[in-house]
């Protein structure tokens, strides 16, 4: 019997990536989120493909085509809600995956980490253009407000915005191109994910201790295939719970009103997974300053390897850094809450303080605390 996994050029790649891959014996459930993100991506591409078969990217018919999908297409409602809530699951897994990387020092794999940050940006861009497609009130005004931010770029800003819009306002041309972007970007994400994996398999996985695990490796299959399968079952259970019992819980009621350029909603806000960045944007009164802070809030992740001053890779044995990490998590949850609140006292002040704390922890406190821990180890 010929072992195809060892002889076929194609199966050899699959074998080396998912079957005979040497993996650390002590990686915890925090390492499950990579495979869960892969499942989310496949799920989003499949549900999105079926939605695209019935969706029309025209300002006159977009809203009614989504209604038609929910009412008239066989199981259209479940496909639509799996796609909408699948995006939320995608971002939950994404944030936990990035959080795991920060906590256990996985950012020292430079290529893997930088591709990951690019992936994060691409997924955020995909989610943004996708939110515009149902052409509800929040879709239209969200697109108007966020694309308008580019006008803060000196000299070329206004031209850039009009170029993205395809006119002098968000209209038919904008919706058509956003649909095109939303269709192509997931395939770019899939390609980037493969590059992400390629670089990861060059070094091998990190583990909770941050210590090299070459001395104790186990094959990926069956140990981690079983472990990942459990994670996938739980993910799908949680997603279906959301889809079947509370499909609109994470959405905005304003998006059930067709887009109207003459009527601005009282509170324009993005989906929940962008609220932390939106709160940082709003906390700065200056337009350009806000845009820079918004970009910096994600781009700051690229600096993580440079800001690592500890002699230990992981936070597992660094209690002070752990405290700071969980303060950062609490701060991000506070920013998420603030992003959904109206622009008035006391929310503005809380948002400004939380934004300052976010940058303060990452840029200043983390490196200082790490250095203090290094000195304490000398005792």
Swiss-Prot record:
- Residues engaged in binding a ubiquinone: 201
Cross-referenced CDD domains: cytochrome_b_C (cd00290), Cytochrome_b_N (cd00284)
Q: How does it sit in the membrane?
A: Multi-pass membrane protein
Entry keyword set: Electron transport, Heme, Iron, Membrane, Metal-binding, Mitochondrion, Mitochondrion inner membrane, Respiratory chain, Transmembrane, Transmembrane helix, Transport, Ubiquinone
**Does the keyword field hold Transmembrane helix?**
yes
Which GO molecular function annotation, any one, does this entry have? metal ion binding
Q: Which co-factor is required?
A: heme b
Q: GO cellular component annotations, sorted alphabetically?
A: mitochondrial inner membrane; respiratory chain complex III
The protein's matches in InterPro entries, at most eight in alphabetical order, are given as: Cyt_b/b6_C, Cyt_b/b6_C_sf, Cyt_b/b6_N, Cytb/b6-like_sf, Cytochrome_b, Cytochrome_b_C_euk/bac, Cytochrome_b_N_euk/bac, Di-haem_cyt_TM
- What does this protein's record comment on cofactor binding? Binds 2 heme b groups non-covalently.
Biological process GO terms, please?
A: mitochondrial electron transport, ubiquinol to cytochrome c
Entries under Pfam families matching the protein = Cytochrom_B_C (PF00032), Cytochrome_B (PF00033)
* Positions bound to heme b b566: 97, 196
Q: What is its main location?
A: mitochondrion
Positions of transmembrane segments: 33-53, 77-98, 113-133, 178-198, 226-246, 288-308, 320-340, 347-367
Question: Which proteins does it associate with, and in what oligomeric form?
Answer: The cytochrome bc1 complex contains 11 subunits: 3 respiratory subunits (MT-CYB, CYC1 and UQCRFS1), 2 core proteins (UQCRC1 and UQCRC2) and 6 low-molecular weight proteins (UQCRH/QCR6, UQCRB/QCR7, UQCRQ/QCR8, UQCR10/QCR9, UQCR11/QCR10 and a cleavage product of UQCRFS1). This cytochrome bc1 complex then forms a dimer.
Q: What is this protein called?
A: Cytochrome b
| Organism listed in the record | Axis axis
